[in-house]
Amino acid sequence: MNSSSAPNSYWNQKPVLSSGQKPSGIRDSRPKEDDYGVLDAKTFDAIEADELFDSVNHAITHAGQSVLYRSLARPETDAALIQKKQEAVRELASNSMLREALQHFVDTMKEGEQSLYHLLYGTFTGGIAVDNSRGGKDEMEFSGYGYHQFIDGTGFAIDMVETMEILPQPQSAYLRELFQAVRDFGKSRIYSLLRGPVYVSEGKFKTREEKPRYLPLSRFTPSMFKPIPVFFAVAALGAALYFFQGLLASFGIAYLGYGILVLAVPILPVVLIAIAASDRDTVIYPLRKLFKHSPELARLVDVLGMLDELLSFHRYSVAFGGKMTLPEISERERHALEVTEARNPVLARANSNYVPNDVSLDEAGRLLVITGPNSGGKTAYCKTVVQFQLLGQIGCYIPAAVGRLVLAEHIFYQVPDPGHLDEGMGRFGHELKRTREIFFNSTPRSLVVLDELSEGTTFEEKMELSEYVLAGFYKLGASTLLVTHNHELCERLQDKGIGRYLQGEFSPQGPTYRLIPGVSRVSHADRVAAALGFSKEDVEKHLASRS
């Protein structure tokens, strides 16, 4: 395939089509412990990326869901590519004819997608009975020799190439490139092998175009019924019957020839089974190994997933409810994120009463300190910020009125994690190690969230350490959010002219979940304890009842 005709930077991602013994899982692309891309494994878990995927996911194909999950787990940093994806999403929203045609295309391909996986990863156990891969089974073990799976699986690729030719032509560059990628696949050698016929020569496979015109070669027929072997077997039986009829007639026992014929008939299915087993082991299995390791076929499956992903974005924007927007993608040296009326993409789903907040991380306010009592919406706000960054960075809608962002090189989210302590290191050392890791990997185009800082030490040490760490992030230029109950720290930073400050708003009835300017100096810990049934009065009542 001519890779220049597709979004080149996207092909740097690992394909969703597995080259191994089993099909890939939808969530196989989640970051590992040693991954240092835009997201690391700890951040991925802390921001509830799996829940975000569940909220956004409206893809219908396995490839589409895998591509969407991969986009969230390993987001792009190429602003031009994301802008092209947004252009394609806008075209689908405005061009109903194209959207409906593409939706029908993806619906049709979904029916054949599983057939491809059955061919590539199925085990064919032999026997006369066959399991048709269009029967809806999830298992990867089939009786028969793989003929049905070969026909259905290769038919998926053939249908995709042929159907693409009759779709309305898009105007957006991203969609045009994906369409062209399918056409390029139709010109590849691997497509010729999938389409057939396939010729076998000394253990190697040749396409129709590669076969010498006047050289007779064995042609693979994906069927247990083989006309030529059957013809020769029947001819041999007929010749044998003719010979034995004449020979036995001379002894007056010509009737025995028919008995010999009856005994010889079962040889025919034995021969056919042997040929079918040979087809499976010498043609189907080797061919599918070639298919699984084909970058061209992997890209074709990726294209299906990428088209389904775009349609999923559109369906998500319609189903979520309320204001939705595609954020403007800016290219700057420093990270920035500005959103009006932001609603959390997980918590606000189908919740018309969710309280929106504005987000402003710019040059003047790249250090944002959020204070306030527990249950006031501080953590939800921070997760909204990071989840918006992630959705914008994959070309998806965000639940907001207006948005603008710069793609982040790195996104970090630190939360207290006392349950995973390193050997010989207490909570303070463990969390400080994580903060150090974040700091030394951050750049001016990074987004960092610190949910509490320097826990597990004395107040004086916490103040000193937090102050110089936050000043360091500020000088570094990364967009940094700190969640804290420490208003004394805020006062020190304010004295240095560093940071912008928000606090959770509370009414007499409780939290409003709106963040307003200022520094909170109240706790409301008694209110939270009372709501949980663990206030001072609850403790005293329990002790009184025990005595």
Task: List each model region and its residues.
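Transmembrane alpha-helical hairpins and terminal membrane-anchor modules
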Residues: L215-Y285
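Conserved amphipathic alpha-helical "coupling/scaffold" segments
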Residues: M1-I228, K292-R299, V303-M306, T325-P327, ...
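Short N-terminal helix-initiation segments at or just after the protein's N-terminus
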Residues: P31-K32, I275-R280, L450
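ATPase nucleotide-binding head domains, primarily ABC-like/P-loop NTPase cores
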Residues: I260-L272, L310-S547
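Juxtamembrane/interface segments at transmembrane-helix termini
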Residues: N2-P7, L272-K289, F313-A319, G395
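Short amphipathic alpha-helical segments with heptad-repeat character
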Residues: I273, L287, F291-S294, A298-V301, ...
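Transmembrane helical bundles of ABC transporter permease domains
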Residues: I284-G322
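Short, flexible segments with low predicted structural confidence
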Residues: P23-D28, V38-D40, V271-L272, S278-D279, ...
